[in-house]
């Protein structure tokens, strides 16, 4: 029996014939083209993924920059509001102190005026009482024209000294 009786020989012959048939039909070109197409598709997907990653990184950087800017603006607004509030409080305090000082001065003026008026009223009442008492005493003790002249002169003198 020889070499042609062995199963391995026929497997090898079938393999060689199959490979020759594949070569004749151009199967290797179809397989290579399919592999090239797959490689190109994978490369395109990787390029697209890299492009998307770069865009995402730019968007993230832009977001962070905007957020930092917004935080700086918020801090500026807050510090400005605090400064305005402090300024308004200081102005209000100064206005209140000025108002209280003016009211105090006005009240003191009114009190001094009322006090002066009261003193003048008391002096006038005392002068009237003294004049009336002097007139009564003089009219009872001195009679006639001399009494009237003395009485008039005395009343005028008392009034001028007491007022």
Swiss-Prot record:
Record flagged with keyword Transmembrane helix: yes
Broad class of where this protein is predominantly found: membrane
CDD domains: ATP-synt_Fo_b
Keyword Lipid metabolism: no
Compartment annotation: Cell inner membrane
Membrane disposition: Single-pass membrane protein
Keyword entries, A-Z: ATP synthesis, Cell inner membrane, Cell membrane, CF(0), Hydrogen ion transport, Ion transport, Membrane, Transmembrane, Transmembrane helix, Transport
GO terms, molecular function: proton-transporting ATP synthase activity, rotational mechanism; proton-transporting ATPase activity, rotational mechanism
Cellular component terms (Gene Ontology): plasma membrane; proton-transporting ATP synthase complex
Membrane-spanning segments: 7-27
Role this protein plays: F(1)F(0) ATP synthase produces ATP from ADP in the presence of a proton or sodium gradient. F-type ATPases consist of two structural domains, F(1) containing the extramembraneous catalytic core and F(0) containing the membrane proton channel, linked together by a central stalk and a peripheral stalk. During catalysis, ATP synthesis in the catalytic domain of F(1) is coupled via a rotary mechanism of the central stalk subunits to proton translocation.
Subunit structure: F-type ATPases have 2 components, F(1) - the catalytic core - and F(0) - the membrane proton channel. F(1) has five subunits: alpha(3), beta(3), gamma(1), delta(1), epsilon(1). F(0) has three main subunits: a(1), b(2) and c(10-14). The alpha and beta chains form an alternating ring which encloses part of the gamma chain. F(1) is attached to F(0) by a central stalk formed by the gamma and epsilon chains, while a peripheral stalk is formed by the delta and b chains.
Membership in a protein family: Belongs to the ATPase B chain family.
Protein name, entry field: ATP synthase subunit b 1
Organism: Rhodopseudomonas palustris (strain BisB5)
Gene that specifies this protein: atpF1
């Amino acid at each position: 029996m020889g070499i042609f009786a062995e199963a391995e020989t026929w497997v090898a012959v079938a393999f060689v014939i199959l490979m020759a048939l594949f070569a004749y039909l151009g199967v290797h070109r179809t397989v290579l083209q399919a592999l090239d197409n797959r490689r190109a598709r994978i490369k395109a997907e990787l390029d697209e993924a890299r492009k998307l990653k770069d865009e995402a990184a730019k968007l993230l950087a832009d977001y962070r920059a905007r957020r930092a800017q917004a935080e700086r603006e918020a801090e500026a607004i807050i510090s400005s509001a605090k400064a305005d509030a402090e300024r308004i409080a200081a102005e209000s305090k100064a206005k209140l102190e000025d108002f209280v000082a003016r009211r105090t001065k006005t009240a003191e003026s009114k009190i001094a005026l009322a006090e002066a008026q009261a003193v003048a009223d008391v002096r006038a009442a005392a002068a009237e009482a003294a004049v009336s008492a002097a007139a009564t005493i003089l009219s009872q003790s001195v009679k006639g024209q001399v009494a009237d002249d003395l009485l008039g002169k005395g009343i005028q003198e008392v009034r001028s000294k007491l007022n």
